[in-house]
């Protein structure tokens, strides 16, 4: 389960998103402690692209800080890194996780994430390489999953909205590249 601060949430005034991040920080520990709840839960924050980077990182910090203010970070907490366009963004996400761990005195490797594949650049780089394989490598043990974003990826490929689905050939291609990139790494596909 991911509580969405990205496309589904939209752009809100900072004070409103701050309040919502605080509410999510209060909700997640109880949700993850519930034996009938999800085994993984967290947030999808705004991307690391320049227009949304500051807001996304602030939301991530507020959620992590808020949960830690109430107690230990719950097992099963996970964040989704959306709209990744380059290996550099994954490297930056690793640095963000390391800094949050340092600031909050958490053991190295505590914070984990999934990479949401919803841009064409994440599948095929300008040099013809499968960028997603480099993303997995850059994340190291922090990346536990790749998540395919059907609608954004299909739109980026020029697929009409009425034709966007997991069954479209562009989705088949992207998912096949993701599967090959993740093979043998322990990174799961979702």
What are these regions (language model features)?
Residues 1-190:
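Conserved alpha/beta-domain cores
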């Amino acid at each position: 389960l991911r509580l969405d601060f990205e496309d589904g949430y939209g752009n809100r005034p900072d004070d409103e998103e701050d309040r919502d991040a605080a509410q999510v920080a209060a909700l997640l520990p109880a949700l993850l402690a519930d034996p009938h709840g999800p085994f993984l839960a967290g947030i999808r924050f705004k991307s690391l692209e320049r227009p949304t980077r500051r807001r996304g990182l602030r939301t991530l910090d507020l959620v992590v800080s808020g949960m830690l203010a109430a107690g230990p970070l719950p097992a099963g907490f996970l964040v989704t890194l959306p709209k990744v366009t380059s290996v550099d963004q994954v490297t930056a996400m690793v640095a963000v996780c390391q800094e949050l761990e340092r600031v909050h005195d958490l053991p190295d490797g505590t914070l984990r994430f999934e990479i949401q594949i919803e841009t064409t650049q994440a599948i095929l780089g300008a040099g013809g390489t499968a960028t997603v394989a480099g993303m997995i490598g850059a994340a190291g043990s922090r990346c536990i999953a790749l998540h395919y974003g059907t609608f954004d990826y299909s739109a980026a490929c020029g697929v009409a909205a009425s034709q966007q689905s997991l069954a479209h050939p562009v989705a088949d291609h992207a998912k096949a590249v993701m599967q090959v990139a993740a093979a043998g790494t322990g990174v799961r596909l979702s």
